[in-house]
Amino acid sequence: MARQQAPPWVHVALILFLLSLGGAIEIPMDPSIQNELTQPPTITKQSVKDHIVDPRDNILIECEAKGNPAPSFHWTRNSRFFNIAKDPRVSMRRRSGTLVIDFRSGGRPEEYEGEYQCFARNKFGTALSNRIRLQVSKSPLWPKENLDPVVVQEGAPLTLQCNPPPGLPSPVIFWMSSSMEPITQDKRVSQGHNGDLYFSNVMLQDMQTDYSCNARFHFTHTIQQKNPFTLKVLTTRGVAERTPSFMYPQGTSSSQMVLRGMDLLLECIASGVPTPDIAWYKKGGDLPSDKAKFENFNKALRITNVSEEDSGEYFCLASNKMGSIRHTISVRVKAAPYWLDEPKNLILAPGEDGRLVCRANGNPKPTVQWLVNGDPLQSAPPNPNREVAGDTIIFRDTQISSRAVYQCNTSNEHGYLLANAFVSVLDVPPRMLSPRNQLIRVILYNRTRLDCPFFGSPIPTLRWFKNGQGSNLDGGNYHVYENGSLEIKMIRKEDQGIYTCVATNILGKAENQVRLEVKDPTRIYRMPEDQVAKRGTTVQLECRVKHDPSLKLTVSWLKDDEPLYIGNRMKKEDDSLTIFGVAERDQGSYTCMASTELDQDLAKAYLTVLADQATPTNRLAALPKGRPDRPRDLELTDLAERSVRLTWIPGDDNNSPITDYVVQFEEDQFQPGVWHDHSKFPGSVNSAVLHLSPYVNYQFRVIAVNEVGSSHPSLPSERYRTSGAPPESNPSDVKGEGTRKNNMEITWTPMNATSAFGPNLRYIVKWRRRETRETWNNVTVWGSRYVVGQTPVYVPYEIRVQAENDFGKGPEPETVIGYSGEDLPSAPRRFRVRQPNLETINLEWDHPEHPNGILIGYTLRYVPFNGTKLGKQMVENFSPNQTKFSVQRADPVSRYRFSLSARTQVGSGEAATEESPTPPNEATPTAAPPTLPPTTVGTTGLVSSTDATALAATSEATTVPIIPTVVPTTVATTIATTTTTTAAATTTTTTESPPTTTTGTKIHETAPDEQSIWNVTVLPNSKWANITWKHNFRPGTDFVVEYIDSNHTKKTVPVKAQAQPIQLTDLFPGMTYTLRVYSRDNEGISSTVITFMTSTAYTNNQTDIATQGWFIGLMCAIALLVLILLIVCFIKRSRGGKYPVREKKDVPLGPEDPKEEDGSFDYSDEDNKPLQGSQTSLDGTIKQQESDDSLVDYGEGGEGQFNEDGSFIGQYTVRKDKEETEGNESSEATSPVNAIYSLA
């Protein structure tokens, strides 16, 4: 009967079961164990996969391995057996598989190129090296060529191609002149990654040198030089400015593939005049700041150690003042195989189960191939104890015959990985690896560890016993580690004795003993005191020591922390140091150091030496004061369920009495390693009862305090754990706030270790709609927040958070009120526009019907217009209680369009729009009334701080700013960008409780009640801008200025307190920026975002019009025309006779209003003004013309001096009567100037 195959879930279950098994056996590094145990071979050293060698040296291909017995080696070349014995040039090193190919007797290294693989074999298996590809380095010569001079126009782009000869490895390229001077590279001239030299625009100075491409080859250490290029630059009178264009890469898009772990290099080189600047961006995200860096004057972007998240679209932006272009590079990240779980050597005992796992990833997904002893697993003899499940080999009930070396080969199109892992089956009884019957001496109250290293297969079980009896030592004051070491946390006298460790497995047992002796600590109980002595007297410093009598005591002295030389004037005894005939050089600090081979203790005193005339009247005043020494020998007694007594020995007060002792504690569950203050006690006590919280593993230390400062903390006490209990409190600072319009986030401050009272602290969160009597919703949370979803907009909720641990629940929690998320408000109701007179427009409105949150104010946008002519948009922000506003009109004929919207924390809602009434003297517009214009940047630099609806105006219309008169009026001496903000109200405005209505008319708002930033003013130039603002923060507050250019590059500038105004100095001419100011301590408090534009920079490339040929020719033509007209006039004047007046008479008057072209909105009373063209003298007469026979005297509108055919009626007189020029005609001259009227 054929064997039925198990379903797939059986294999999965088996793998999960094996994962739960203990780890494999590790062989210790003990040489005796290593030499005794048998072991399959393991590759320990090999050459790299791509092995490039120097043809001038002998070839060395490394392969070394270990095993017991020692392995033998053989090689394959190009997958075929490589017979070393047949080639006299090839030899193998002794006790190694390393190949040496010797060319001293001749031969060509190229003949040995190929793919090599090493095999290490003993009777337990065969291990394989990587497939090593051997290549010989090549450095070919540059082909001979004659290069003609390169002719290029000044300002044009140029590429000098290098085209180096192919080498192995690729050579390093650099450019130099024929005189071996390096070519200076900058933003305009630079070398690309391909080795070519790029000129963004050629200048005349580029002819001063030649250009030679050089290739440096690594292995041969040689440099090949290409014939140099010479440039011939054709000059012009002026170099035309050009928009950027890409020299490399070509086109608007390209793609690039890179392997994971490699470096990604993107390059963009552009031409243009002026030289373009290059900026880099990633579509849909930011550049990785930790891996990205810019090279080659920003023309190259390098991203190191590429990973899959670095794939995507990158684009470079090349820009100068003439314009900008961009090139998009689509980056695809592939991956050669890399290890997720590399197979490890497996050492098992007979009958044990185990597994080999080989998991790798890559792009595309790599395939896995198993081999055993170098042969495919499919062709190996069947083994019933072995099963292959994809990337895992499962071994069950292994036996000695199961020993082998397995290879996992995982590969894709980009590379491969090969790993060896052997399976060794050992049956070894337990063995002790440390010396027997060790003696360990320790000091009382210290921590110590007793080691007992062991080995066996199967892995033995280790137990500890004391004095040969009793139960296994583990728990309480003892802790046994996995390696067999026994730790005693705090040594006491009763811990002295003989400790036995016993290792046991199915093959037997082994034991070892360790004798522990506990010694008393060394203590100085009579310390030397600070002394003041006169010169020439005798001084004695005491130092009496208590120590363990079984230990040898050594007492030594230090002066100023250096070993003291005991001379003839000094006498050292067991318990003192005497100094005879004290001199000034004896002044300083003296340290008594008492030490044994296990510990030591120190005590310090200061000796002050006075001159003969000095008298130590105030001894303490002469002694230096210092911080106290640390307390020592902490001891816990009177252990109770909720209290413990802590006792300590005070340290030296260093001439300043100890005023306080601070007791600190540390717990190892919530914040291990962090010390907290527990209590404070007077300096006169050295013992105190500490009240404790349930379920805390306490450890204490003590700090002494005097008037100089605090001592170093004492060494920590032993730990003491209290029993658990239900919590006695609940978390604080419970809040409910919406982060979106349809949710509510419930947060609280989590409880600390001293309030948890038990294990598994958690929180029961309850919520329901306020005043609905609904059933409470509840959930158990382990963190400090919970988000309730699918909530209505801005609805109040009742919230409760209760603490709970494994011992029970905390007290009933208090109910707090939270709100779900806000949304945009509806439009203000009953928006009304009234015009009581021609100078004032009054606005009134009611609060929105649906605030959808807390109203923080209103935003009014309004713009004046006259027909299709549009003025500048104005923006006003109001407090949430304001419902009236007045606008003072700039002129009596302009109308206004208003847009009013309410604001919540989310933003501005739907707007209510109205228009002012039509003035009585305004002409009916031919087009639809204009809507609010978008915020635009004018040439003056005055910019609105908020957006508005775009205006659809005809192309003939000219937008003219009309600024209404507003009270109070603010006149700025510089053109600036200003914004206003309004503080948020703390309560919601509703129709049930109408707020107090206020009226205001303003441009710049006054400071709000809450902390805010307003009146941000920007004074821009071409490359810098000055920023000022107003705020109502406390003095000393720091701010941050954040601005973003039109390329979406964001920068921030920290501003110290009282540092206004500040200057932004890294701006670009003619670029638009958005800017805001916010508090450094609270980014949520920010000014309104404003927009401004820097002015266009002046460049020296601007052409002088007076030097242009076309202008000179035009001037010459005008001069010639004027000369011809003068000659004609002279001829006509000299001829006399009849004048051809018909042409003059038929010319119609064509008045043109310069104000109409100018687009002015000025109005004038033409009936009450003198005609602009008249030039009346003081006596009311028109002045005599320069020529008596001028044609003006015979123009239309005068008395009839011509007949119907245009001939003269009378003779042409030399002088006309003065009276003919007087009368009513003088006020109605027919000059064309008089026909010009202002068109309102």
From Swiss-Prot:
Stretches that traverse the bilayer: 1111-1131
Glycosylation sites recorded in the entry for this protein: N305, N409, N446, N483, N752, N778, N866, N881, N1015, N1026, N1047, N1101
GO biological process terms held by the UniProt record: axon guidance; cell-cell adhesion; clustering of voltage-gated sodium channels; myelination; paranodal junction assembly; peripheral nervous system development; protein localization to juxtaparanode region of axon; protein localization to paranode region of axon
Biased composition (Acidic residues): 1154-1165
Biased composition (Pro residues): 917-933
Keyword Transport in annotation: no
A GO MF term: protein domain specific binding
GO cellular component: axon; axon initial segment; dendrite; node of Ranvier; paranodal junction; paranode region of axon; plasma membrane; Schwann cell microvillus
Residue numbers carrying Phosphotyrosine: Y481
Disulfide bonds: C63-C118, C162-C213, C268-C316, C358-C408, C452-C501, C543-C592
Cytoplasmic topological segments: 1132-1240
Entry-linked Gene3D superfamilies: Immunoglobulins
Annotated stretches, region: Disordered: 710-740, 902-942, 982-1002, 1141-1240
InterPro entries, per database record: FN3_dom, FN3_sf, Ig-like_dom, Ig-like_dom_sf, Ig-like_fold, Ig_I-set, Ig_sub, Ig_sub2
Domain Fibronectin type-III: 630-725, 727-823, 827-922, 1007-1099
Places the protein is found: Cell membrane
Role of this protein: Cell adhesion, ankyrin-binding protein which may be involved in neurite extension, axonal guidance, synaptogenesis, myelination and neuron-glial cell interactions. Isoform 2/isoform 3 may be responsible for mediating and signaling axon-glial interaction during the early stages of myelination.
Family designation: Belongs to the immunoglobulin superfamily. L1/neurofascin/NgCAM family.
Subunit structure: Horseshoe-shaped homodimer. Probable constituent of a NFASC/NRCAM/ankyrin G complex. Associates with the sodium channel beta-1 (SCN1B) and beta-3 (SCN3B) subunits. Associates to subunit beta-1 in developing axons as early as postanatal day 5, during the period that nodes of Ranvier are forming. Isoform 2/isoform 3 is likely to interact with axonal proteins in close association with CNTNAP1. Interacts with GLDN/gliomedin. Interacts with MYOC.
Protein name: Neurofascin
Organism, scientific name: Rattus norvegicus
Gene that produces this protein: Nfasc
